[in-house]
């Protein structure tokens, strides 16, 4: 207990609440436009892992650069720490190719990948997934049996068919067109009525906008 886990700052409060509930100690690390600040991360001692959202940082919307990702992987290898990648909002990149998962950068990278279907199916569709190294599969299977007793098997079978038959990918393509138009409309409205008060921060993707006021 009391293991230290680094998190991006600003962060998703639920992540902090969950860590503290489990007896972990969250260590906030500032985020830059290139991703989590590696130099500040290196100054921390005895960090067991780091939770990052490299594809679309919440709440600022930054996308971690490939160079920063490489540095993060190198840090994890040196420290013997785990990287937990929450692939938040990654499907909805407008006019851009999907970004590779951190584990794809290097074989054997100490990464645990988290994904969810909530953003692209519907908000109440609470089904998520994890991709873990082979040596951790048994551990996570045991944990899943203890903490997840309510996931609908029917929903899982339907989703599997939806993906295998190619419907999921065409569905995501349609969603991207819809959300891109909505985002563009929101950006235009903000530019017209609020530009004197601040600016939009982050990349042009995902389902949320972050507006930074000039004078908080």
Label the predicted regions.
Residues 1-216:
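PLP-dependent class I/II
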